[in-house]
Amino acid sequence: MIIIPARLKSSRFENKVLEDIFGLPMVVRCAKNANLVDECVVACDDESIMQTCQKFHIKAVLTSKHHNSGTERCLEAVQILGLKNDERVLNLQGDEPFLEKEVILALLEATKNAPFMATCAKVIDEEQAKSPNLVKVVLDSQNNALYFSRSLIPFLRDFDAKRQTPLLGHIGIYGFHNKEILEELCALKPCVLEEIEKLEQLRALYYQKKILVKIVQSQSVGIDTQEDLQNALKIFSPDLLER
């Protein structure tokens, strides 16, 4: 089951999930991509998103406006839907309308092998890594996340040295091996690191939970601001989305 948490009043770009992407609302684009892989449900926090999904025949449920994270919203949706305890749950984003089907499939496969949860990352360049909107991740020898940050990690102390490890940009999608793991994560108290960085995935690392990271090839970009949207519409084309 794929859940897409969709919040109307995003702090940096209000109503962005309803913005037009080549003739379809952004959240509808995201859901159509997800439905190519598995059954998808949008977890809405507002009737306007719910009505938009229904208009385009996208399954949706109405959740509380008061969740602290998309993961918490996913859990409420899972509870409303009555998913079985052993069913895998993927948490995709409502602001990733250009996410490729292949990336979702890679996450699904990684989730099967993850002891707790899985996510994805892609290789990025130094210029991309400078943006605090693009979260970076560093891995251990088993491809588990060591840390996620909006800062540049790993930092290259010797600027003349050749970088020995690629910079990895996090793709904010998550896979949970089963419903119980999702419940376990949401039951943990928020930690200071996630509050500082505003990154919910740091809660899992703080409590020593493993996040398996699958490195993928992706041209997708998350839409955090109006500028992001305008830039993306210049890069992508309707033909590319109708794959």
Curated annotation (Swiss-Prot):
Pfam families in UniProt: CTP_transf_3 (PF02348)
CDD domains: CMP-KDO-Synthetase
A GO cellular-component term linked to this record: cytosol
Keyword Iron-sulfur: no
Record-linked InterPro entries: Cytidylyl_trans, KdsB, Nucleotide-diphossugar_trans
Gene, per the UniProt record: kdsB
Source organism, top-level taxon: Bacteria
Name of the protein in its database record: 3-deoxy-manno-octulosonate cytidylyltransferase
